[in-house]
Structure formats: structure tokens, C-alpha cells
Amino acid sequence: MAMPDFTMRQLLEAGVHFGHHTRRWNPRMAPFLFGVRNQVHIIDLQQTVPMLDRALKAIRDTVAGGGRVLFVGTKRAAADQIAEAAKRSGQYYVNHRWLGGMLTNWKTITGSIKRLRQIDDMLTGDTHGLTKKEILDITRNREKLERSLGGIKEMGGLPDILFVIDTNKEKLAVEEANKLGIPVVAILDSNSDPRGVTFPIPGNDDAIRAIALYCELVSGAVLDGISAELGASGQDFGAAEELPVDTAAEAAAAEAAPAA
């Protein structure tokens, strides 16, 4: 594996340079803006390129050191791609709704995850003695928990770095990470607040093509980090590279998981 490459042309074609209408801007983003076109702020890709590269290396190095990455993106344009990228690289995600205390009250979240596992065991086991209504209620409860916690139920502890799409919508996630000293990699649009973001990436956080590109690059950086971690432990990642990506990621994730 190798760090994912990207070009200025790819960023342009994905619309990474398009910000919001000038009336919606955040003045704190002024240093990262190139100018205005048709009343829309244009993001300075000359800054985005090195900042994106720096962020990807931070993610890669975190994973190479055995760390976990939490992908966060709950808005409709990002939700599916965030989940797919995390699964593809054997990592974790929140793509439904950020629950208050998801990081800062991890003990309570762990209890909810335990409840989700218990329900899974109940529904896959013997349901004799339960009425249809009871089974339906339990199933609905499970679906609710799965939407909120399904992406982190195998995480086993706090993440070591966050990757965030849309810091305005995910403000609570950024604040909780800051309180715990967890580094944050985030896409910053022209209406974003860069405060609290350790590795900012100026770019469009709404366009589906742009989000797809970010997710592809971040998952690639994660897989490169997994490769480096396995290589450092004397294991051959070459065979895993020949597997489908999902299979390789699952194998790597299992290797990195703490013992029960």
C-alpha cells in the first residue's frame, strides 16, 4: 500500500473550490479564500493541497501507531459515504446523529452498546415466550440503537483521531474531541469555524463528488497506515493487498482489535 495521491485537477473537477454565497461566510475563513465569483466564495486550493496532504499523513501515522479513526458525517450528502469509507478501511463511524456525550461520556455509551449486543443475541436466539408485539418493540429498539451506535459498537474505546465532514453540523463532536485532546481532521467550507480543528482542510463540504473524494483519500490513508503497522510487526500485508478491500480492512481491524 502507499499513501493516496491526488491532484489539483481532481480537486477542481470535484468542485472542492466552491464555497457558499458571500452572505453566508464565516470571516474566520478569510485566510483560506481565494476570492469571489458570482457572489460565491472561491476556496484557495493552493492552500488546500498541502493542508490535505498534511491531514492524510496525520491519519496514516495515527493508524500506523495502532490508533483508531472515527469518521463523522451525519448530513444526508455525507452519511452513506462516511459509513462506506469507514467500513472499507476497517474503522468506525457516526452517520446518523451525534449523541451528546458520545466521547465525553463514553461509559454510558458503552452501556448502550452492551444493550445493543444483548438485543442482537436475544433476536438471533430463542424468542419463544415473547409475543409478536414484544418482538416488534424489541426490534424497533434495536434498529434505533443500531442507527446511532452501529458504527462504533466494535470500537472498544475512544478514537485517536476524528475525520469530520461539516463542522457546523458536527459542532458537538468537535467540542467533545477538543475536551479530551483528541485531534480533529475536518473539511472547512467558507461558512465554517476553523477553531478547534487540528488539521483543517479548506474545501466544499456539500458537493457529493467532493465528499466522495475526501472519503476515498482518507480511507486510503487509513489502509496505508494499517499496512505500515503490520509491516512494523513483521507481518506480510502483500497477501491482504490482493484481497478485496473490505476483506483486507476486516482482517487488519481484527488484528488491531484489543484482546477480549
Curated annotation (Swiss-Prot):
SUPFAM superfamilies xref list: Ribosomal protein S2 (SSF52313)
InterPro entries: Ribosomal_uS2 (IPR001865), Ribosomal_uS2_bac/mit/plastid (IPR005706), Ribosomal_uS2_CS (IPR018130), Ribosomal_uS2_flav_dom_sf (IPR023591)
One GO-annotated biological process of the protein: translation
Pfam families per UniProt: Ribosomal_S2 (PF00318)
This protein's GO CC annotations: cytosolic small ribosomal subunit
Keyword Mitochondrion found: no
CDD domains according to UniProt: RPS2
Keyword line: Ribonucleoprotein, Ribosomal protein
The keyword Ribosomal protein appears for this protein: yes
Record GO terms (molecular function): structural constituent of ribosome
Family membership noted in the UniProt record: Belongs to the universal ribosomal protein uS2 family.
NCBIfam families per record: rpsB_bact (TIGR01011)
The name this protein goes by in its record: Small ribosomal subunit protein uS2
Organism of this sequence: Gluconacetobacter diazotrophicus (strain ATCC 49037 / DSM 5601 / CCUG 37298 / CIP 103539 / LMG 7603 / PAl5)
Gene it is expressed from: rpsB
